[in-house]
Amino acid sequence: MNCELCEQAAGVILWRDEFCRVVRVASDEFPAFCRVILARHVREMTDLAAPERERLMRVVFACEQALREVVRPHKVNLASLGNQVPHLH
């Protein structure tokens, strides 16, 4: 399998454990752009067991809270996209 999110950090790693990692993506347009990337290759949220989906979303919500406290943005955008790379992020 050839998956760039399996093979590369895909940004500056801010936090990681055995389940997933949080990376800061270099973006001039979105300076606080972060991704939560699953450690193993999974294409869709529904491919995860319910406890895994909940665990992943806890990390997403922790990132949102941290960004709100540190960056104080007008709005936080949460998105689940896989249109470029078929790896859950």
Model-derived features: positions:
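HIT superfamily nucleotide-processing domains
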Residues: M1-L88
